């Protein structure tokens, strides 16, 4: 019998990683213009494992600052609330993904590589477009495959079976999920994000990142996650580079002013961004969290 979305959400609702309480509160505080540095410091300090992960990531190659950051208040002042929010979400997502070592550890590393790449690409696209906050775009990109992460950790056999079906039959991973499980990782990820009280716009972006035209709250956020996902797959980063890849959404391309004929150029510019950026270091960010958890 296959698990339902509701059963999986209930299974992970109270994960022993402080995500159910601390992370949503941090997100709300970072988005509140009235939150002070002292208040945010006090909130995050209630979870010392999160403090450790934040400082590890802040000093890693990926989120590195010009000088070493020694304390949480210093990190908040130097990096800003938006980046702190992204760091908190990055840390807790990695904690979930790398909390155990097993036969799927390398596979999860590929999932993380893809997720991080989509986050970076979404941030770059948002900066170029100018009407979406870059850090919100990063979070939407980073979490777009949250449902896949949940499956790989808590339903390993189903995850492996779906992955093999997608590769063997040359259908999309989403189609393989629907055929074998009756739900998609996008649906599961959105439900888990809602259970963790993440913002509704991010939940919607997760749910609709394969079909951004279905988004109604903030379509641009779903579109940027969709385009970034497509481009990172096109670059060959992640698990599903050999699976069927549908064409990018035309409305999303138009919204981001990317003519279809220009897609190869945009993807190549993204390749250069990754190649030139010391920050795109999956191993460094993974090691930072492994040392802290």
Indicate where each model-derived feature is located:
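Terminal helices and disordered tails flanking the catalytic cores of nucleotide-processing hydrolases
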Residues: 1-8, 250-293
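Conserved alpha-helical "signature site"
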Residues: 1-250, 287-288
């Amino acid at each position: 019998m296959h698990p339902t979305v509701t059963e999986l959400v209930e299974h992970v609702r109270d994960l022993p990683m402080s995500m159910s309480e601390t992370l949503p509160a941090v997100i709300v505080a970072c988005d509140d213009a009235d939150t002070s540095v002292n208040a945010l410091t006090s909130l995050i300090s209630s979870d010392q494992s999160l403090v450790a992960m934040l400082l590890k990531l802040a000093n890693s190659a990926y989120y590195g600052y010009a000088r070493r950051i020694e304390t949480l208040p210093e990190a908040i002042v130097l990096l800003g609330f938006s980046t702190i929010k992204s760091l908190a979400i990055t840390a807790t997502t990695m904690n979930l993904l790398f909390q155990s070592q097993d036969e799927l550890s390398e596979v999860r590393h590929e999932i993380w590589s893809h997720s991080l790449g989509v986050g970076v690409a979404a941030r770059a696209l948002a900066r170029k477009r100018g009407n979406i906050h870059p850090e919100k775009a990063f979070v939407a990109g980073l979490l777009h495959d949250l449902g896949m992460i949940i499956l790989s950790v808590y339903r390993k056999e189903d995850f492996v079976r779906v992955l093999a079906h997608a590769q063997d039959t040359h259908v999309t991973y989403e189609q393989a999920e629907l055929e074998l499980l009756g739900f998609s990782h996008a649906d599961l990820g959105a439900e888990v994000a809602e259970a963790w009280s993440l913002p509704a716009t991010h939940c919607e972006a997760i749910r609709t990142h394969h079909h951004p035209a279905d988004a109604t709250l903030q379509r641009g956020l779903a579109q940027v996650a969709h385009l970034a996902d497509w481009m990172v797959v096109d670059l060959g980063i992640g698990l599903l580079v050999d699976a069927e890849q549908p064409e990018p959404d035309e409305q999303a391309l138009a919204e981001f002013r990317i003519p279809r004929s220009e897609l190869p150029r945009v993807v190549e510019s993204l390749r250069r961004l990754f190649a030139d950026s010391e920050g795109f270091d999956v191993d460094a960010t993974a090691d930072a969290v492994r040392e802290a958890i």
